[in-house]
Amino acid sequence: MTRILQKCNILVFFELKKILYIMSKFNTTVTKSKTLTENLAGGQAYAQSNELALVSMLLTSFVNDQFYKSGSTTLKDLKALSEKIKDKEFVAKAAIYARDKFGMRSITHGLAAELTSQLTGFDWGKNFYDKVVVRPDDMTEILSYYLANNTDKSKPKFPNALKKGFATAFNKFDDYQISKYKMSNKEVKLVDVVNIVHPIPTDRNREALNLLINDKLKNTETWEAKLSAAGQTAENEEDLSKLKSDAWGELISTRRIGYFALLRNLRNIIAQAPDAVTAACELLVDENLIKRSRVLPFRFATAYEEISKLGSDKAVRDVLVAINQALEVSLVNVPKFDGETLVVMDVSGSMSGKPSEIASLFGAILAKVNNCDVMTFSNDAQYKSYNPLDSVMTIRGSFRYSGGGTNFKAIFNKANKKYDRVVLLSDMQGWMGYTTPAFEFASYKKKFDVNPFVYSWDLAGFGTLQFPEQNVFALAGFSDKVFDIMKLMEIDKKALFNEIKAIQLS
């Protein structure tokens, strides 16, 4: 009956109330308590500073619908936050950091487009629009958002900073990259960007730019082009099968397939080019390719789950082993902490989907490396057992989403020993009881005579914290770069902000 009433309360909340953010300025004078706000589940939470809320959103949002909010709402919140922050250089650097270090695309495209009206008069604006571009299609996506939301399509006006920055950004790309990201099937094509910004050709891209402008640029080297050519030239099914096998084999042996494309096409390679599986596995575990790929750790978990569905023959087993090894390589910088550590994972209803996948993966990684205690919580909290000698994926499998409410109080009511640090993986929406767990946290500290570091890891970027900011290190993001920041946190409380501010724009 209690759970039914709680669910009814949430439904009433969604119908009757709009989202309210009460943001506090970053680095204000410390007071006895932070500003209380209401989180998206209707419970109490502490508001983040505007800067921290922005960074959290940038590092966690893939601009898709979440349990408590839609992708369009996220973009509106992003615009509002960027306008509230007076330090525009920090906003710009945060966008670059999220795109370059964490591989976040759509959310940074939206922010870059919104900043066109906020960077007037800043000499470093052109440098921002250069540095926020990592791939050629970053420019087409930013322009697409800009045309849809920030200018009159019939008479579009493009800021000089954007045009100069994009023109310079073309210097990063060679003929292959330009031909790969022509975006010829999109409303905004790469040739449109060229015609708007007029980049100066270099030896790396002169031929491709010339062919692109004259609509003669063809890309025959990508995996899509190779497979398409096989389909067009095959005379029968047997011929098609051989041509596809040859195409995959050539792409893999010549290393002309991107790492992410390789990861996404492992199922096709197993089915269509079994002779190339061994070479594909060698690419998968190549340490240099993994580091350059910018593939987020949860992508390995997704690939592992998909391949696991294919059965148990040798090719499948070999690929699963390679994915496991690649995941381990991608996380060599996971910190080993001194003392006792508790990893706490939210398995409540709001964590369904990607947040749950991320929490279980990163929880397993931290647990394996640190041999620490693990707890899951929803309506209540419970300790979980695991074997640290198992693989990350095996450990992860035991930390599954279960649904239910989000009772943060239960964590510290259940904690039964002194911990030096607590790592909390959650979407930070604590509605059970409608109060923050600050009292329970204080009681825990008093009971065990301890003042632990608390790493509050926001997996959804909803904008509220379950503890006052000064009592925790607020983390966000899905990249293994978060672990680099964690290494600094116990020394430098503002490590994340320092990383962002260190980016050079002028």
Question: Language-model features: where?
Answer:
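Short, conserved loop/turn and helix-capping segments at secondary-structure boundaries
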Residues: 356-360
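Intrinsically disordered, low-complexity segments enriched in serine/proline and basic residues
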Residues: 2-12
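Aromatic (phenylalanine/tyrosine) cluster motif
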Residues: 13-14, 21
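Long lumenal/extracellular ectodomains of secretory and single-pass membrane proteins
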Residues: 23-354, 368-506
